[in-house]
Amino acid sequence: MKKMLYVLVITFLSFTIYSCAKKSDSSSTTATNTVIEGTWQTPCHSSSGYYKLNKLTVSGTNWTDTTEYHTDSSCATDYTKWSTTFGSLSIGSAMVFDSYGSSGGSGAQFTITLSEYTYTIYNSGLVSSNNTNSYCGITDWVLNTAHDVAGKTCGSSTLQSIGTAYYGIYILDGSKLFWTLSSDAYNDSVPTGDNDTFTKQ
């Protein structure tokens, strides 16, 4: 199960799409960073034998998203956390998503640049296992301590390096935010399932 968790977490920036809104028209209007500033959070939900919680904080041109794994259904007991911090947030042209909801949704494309990528373990058994197996090429894992994993190979995946540019799209619906990121190009759709819903805190 741990190996499955590693693979799923490493790819957390590429959401599994159960329902999505496809991007459509863009306009000449440019959105501003302030419309998505704040702290956002998904519901606590089951994922690969654990319970997952995603959080996003946007402040100025900084963007930090975390994927937390917990051992209880209320997401109160920490297990692991992956955190990515980006800078240079730049919002592009406004967009309309005709396939989102009954009246469509509004949003925009944006770009950000990776500035930090960390992994934190809150379970002593997993700390021991990771040290034994040199997970991410690291043998000095410490409980409750974030480790830099940018550019490292963790399991079968090599994580992105600092300075990597990401291309994103978001949909804003009142207090609900949906978004997607890719280091290759803008995705064609945005996940809008219940577990992809970030609610403003």
Question: Whereabouts are the PLM-identified features?
Answer:
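Bacterial Sec-dependent N-terminal signal peptides
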Residues: L13-T39
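Intrinsically disordered, low-complexity segments enriched in glycine/proline and serine/threonine
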Residues: L5-Y6, D25-S26, T192
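N-terminal segment immediately downstream of the Sec signal-peptide cleavage site
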Residues: A31-W63
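Extracellular low-complexity Ser/Thr/Asn/Gly-rich intrinsically disordered segments
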Residues: K23, T29, S59-T64, S88, ...
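Basic side chains
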Residues: K2-K3, K22-K23, K200
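Sec-dependent bacterial lipoprotein signal peptides
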Residues: M1-S19
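Contiguous, well-ordered beta-strand patches that form the walls/edges
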Residues: P43-Y51, T66-S175, T180-Q201
